[in-house]
């Protein structure tokens, strides 16, 4: 085993232990300031592969850091991605036990469900629209296995892009039924509006985010599969969640999606 491979397995184990024990780890970049983005993706894949071997199923992907504000905050110029597993979906209106998360935040976004595979490179926004079966409103519960969210880009990538859970709404729409750029969203916490957003907040168009993902995945020989759920990126800033909170997001033409802690 090479030194790099050993290091990737070691860091993957730190994150896996943090998830198992509920105690956050120190940032990997504080342990290894030279940790690269490519190595971070391999750490993520190491833990995903382990979960698949334990019987979990990859059901989709999530895209993070799609807003310019978040990219500037972490000093990066492109998004990142993580994997969605079958134990991460929560029913619309369902409850997430607070002991299942470490330091959760809630984001509202649009989910794309594909009707055909997409394999980069050179995938365009139009390719994504043509490959999309339907779009559905979603809440993503982001979470970090890193103490106090003290993350740099390699930290969040290694940590499956700070994924936690996700909730899909009930109303499905075809891409020609809505204007993705102008689609408005209102995020409420305990019946008080905490954030508003619009489709253009995600790289100008959420479908552009999905195209980026297809092209990025091709660097690792991975394609987007028909039937997969793709969370296309937050339409506003994330809101902190604690026990007893209820979140709901209302989308123009797409109805409401909610979750309780």
Regions found by a protein language model. Give the residues of each.
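Conserved PLP-enzyme active-site core in the AAT-like
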Residues: 217
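Glycine-rich, small/acidic residue-mixed loop/short-helix segments
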Residues: 208
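Catalytic-core "active-site belt" of small-molecule-metabolizing enzymes
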Residues: 2-203, 246, 254-261
